């Protein structure tokens, strides 16, 4: 799971940086359009690569059978009391994190008059931290601590990161990014690892449901953060994220106790 995070971190490192450098600090409609066209071209190349290089590993007969029972199995997975709390965790974490992703560029523009170039370097730091966390640090920590404790440390780190941003201290922003990157970088693979262990016969379906939770969280998190940003102030979304995660952590402690009783 950690290596998937490393791959994501590499993209998160160089993608925003390249886009920021191309757009520049004093961006124009033309430079922003160029970034969009380049991103589209890269996606097209990626599509061609997938079509020509990857083969379906699931036999056709099994695929047809899975399609027939897909909806019922999906419902069973979501209703599973051993899995549902972790799906909720994924949803909540990515809802607040995607909200930060959607507002941080506008926030830095209003607070520090930063442009795409400066935000690109912020994303460079975030991506680099995720590579370190998921590619190296996770391997060390997982030998000393179980996934539950690492998820808890991720929550604490996310709460600290969201709390530091509204200070509007330019020197604390890198520290906030480090906290946020550790939080998301350590929590996500640990949750996926737990889901994988608890689903011996339906790993693909369970992990796929987890990724669906991520997508749903982004669908809700970014518009909600934008609404709060516009109507209640630029710092309120980050305070909201921190307080919300504290509430989620308390609820998670309650759920985890129930899970242990059932185990």
Region spans (language model):
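C-terminal membrane-cytosol helix-exit motif in multi-pass small-molecule transporters
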Residues: 41-60, 251-256
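Helix-loop-helix hairpin linking two adjacent transmembrane segments in secondary transporters
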Residues: 4-52
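Helix-to-loop junctions at the C-terminal end of transmembrane segments
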Residues: 133-146, 229
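A membrane-interface helix-boundary motif in multi-pass transporters
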Residues: 24-40, 227-245
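A late C-terminal transmembrane helix in Major Facilitator Superfamily
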Residues: 201-231
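Juxtamembrane intracellular "pre-TM" segments in multi-pass secondary transporters
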Residues: 55-88
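Short amphipathic helix-loop junctions that connect adjacent transmembrane helices
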Residues: 102-118
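C-terminal transmembrane helical hairpin of 12-TM major facilitator-type secondary transporters
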Residues: 146-191
């Amino acid at each position: 799971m950690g290596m998937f995070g490393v791959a994501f971190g590499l993209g998160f490192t160089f993608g925003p940086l390249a886009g920021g450098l191309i757009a520049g600090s004093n961006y124009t409609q033309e430079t922003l359009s160029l970034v969009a066209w380049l991103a589209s071209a890269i996606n097209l190349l990626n599509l061609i690569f997938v079509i020509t290089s990857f083969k379906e590993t699931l036999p056709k007969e099994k695929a047809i059978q899975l399609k027939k029972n897909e909806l019922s199995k999906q419902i069973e997975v979501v209703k599973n009391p051993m899995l549902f709390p972790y799906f909720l965790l994924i949803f909540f974490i990515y809802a607040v994190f995607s909200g930060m992703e959607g507002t941080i560029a506008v926030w830095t523009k209003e607070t520090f008059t930063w442009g795409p170039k400066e935000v690109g370097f912020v994303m460079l730091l975030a991506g680099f931290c995720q590579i370190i966390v998921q590619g190296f640090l996770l391997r060390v920590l997982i030998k000393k601590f179980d996934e539950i404790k690492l998820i808890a440390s991720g929550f604490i780190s996310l709460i600290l990161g969201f709390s530091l941003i509204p200070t509007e201290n330019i020197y604390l922003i890198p520290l906030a990014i480090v906290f946020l990157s550790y939080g998301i970088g350590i929590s996500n693979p640990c949750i996926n690892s737990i889901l994988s262990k608890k689903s011996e016969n339906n790993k693909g379906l369970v992990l796929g449901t987890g990724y669906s939770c991520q997508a749903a969280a982004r669908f809700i998190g970014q518009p909600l953060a934008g609404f709060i940003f516009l109507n209640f102030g630029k710092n309120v979304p980050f305070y909201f994220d921190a307080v919300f995660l504290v509430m989620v952590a308390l609820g998670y402690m309650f759920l985890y106790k129930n899970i242990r009783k059932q185990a």
